[in-house]
Amino acid sequence: MKSINTLIPDIYNVMESKEHDGDLSSIAMQAGREVEDAIKDAFTPREDNRGLRMSGIGRCERAQWYNYKGYTPEAIKGEVYLTFLQGHVLEAVLVALIKLSGHTVTDQQKKHTIEGVNGSQDCTIDGELVDIKTASAWSWENKFKESGIADDAFGYIKQLSAYGKGDKRKK
């Protein structure tokens, strides 16, 4: 049985060896559908979502309060939308590679509600709750050091903890 601890070298190995687990066509088709959905979603007008979401954990509390109270936020710029789209596309490709490298992926986009706050986790890999994140070179060097994300400025640990609470996880 594979372990999340070997995930990255396993992905590199499957890319080098071309020896994969699972049905390549089926996994590639699923990734393609997810990329298609991400592109369509990027061009779908946004609904007015004034509620709190688990993905907002770690965001500026003042900005969340203004949003929740109905104040009009600044318009999101094209480059920000492109960053979001890149993250969704890369997530689809990475999940495909994770499956092809023999790891178990479950609970993709599983919905959670904790005390009225909604969220959807990315997936569970080899039994471990995972939220797939992309990072620029600057973010990687400055926020994701070997010591981890101890200060958790983006609220990633709190967000994962909320999903874990939804699953009644102990750790």
Predicted regions and their residues:
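Substrate-binding beta-hairpin/strand module that engages nucleic acids
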Residues: 165-171
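Active-site phosphate/pyrophosphate- and oxyanion-stabilizing loops and adjacent acidic/basic residues
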Residues: 161
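Metal-dependent nuclease catalytic cores that hydrolyze phosphodiester bonds in DNA/RNA
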Residues: 1-129, 136-154
